[in-house]
Amino acid sequence: MKPAEFMGFLHILENMKCNTRHSWTHTGRHESVAEHTFRVCCMAFLLEREFPELDMNRVLKMCLIHDWGEAVTGDIPSFLKTGGDEARELDAIHALTAKLPDREAELNALYAEMEARETPEAKFYKALDRLEAVIQHNEAPMST
C-alpha cells in the first residue's frame, strides 16, 4: 500500500471519531462510532480466554471493521434503519474495501460472513456489538 493510499484511508476512518451514535456516555455527551468500536474490540480481547474454541483473531477483525461503513454514512440507530439505509451502508463498505485492493477480497469475505451470521465467530462478534450498546445505554444518565 502506498503511503498516500494509507493516509487517505485513515482520513476516511477518522470520520468514525466525529460521527456520533444514538447513545450517550456517562458524562452526558454522545458516544462516537469509534468509541463504540473500541469497546467492542476490548470486549472481544478480554473474553478471548473464555472462548478458546473461537478464532479470536477473526472475531477481532470483525469487531474492528464492523462499522467502517458508518465512516461514510454516519450512524443510523437500528430502530430507524431501513432496507435502503442498509443498502447504502453496504455500498459504502464496498467502496471502502475497493480502496484497499490488496485486502479487498479478504474484507468482503469477512463482511459477508458477518452478515450471514452463521459461523460461531460472526455470532459472537454480533453479540458483543449488541451487548456493548446495551451496556452503554445502561451507563448513560437516565436524562439522556
Regions found by a protein language model. Name each.
Residues 1-144:
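Active-site helical microenvironments for divalent-metal-assisted chemistry
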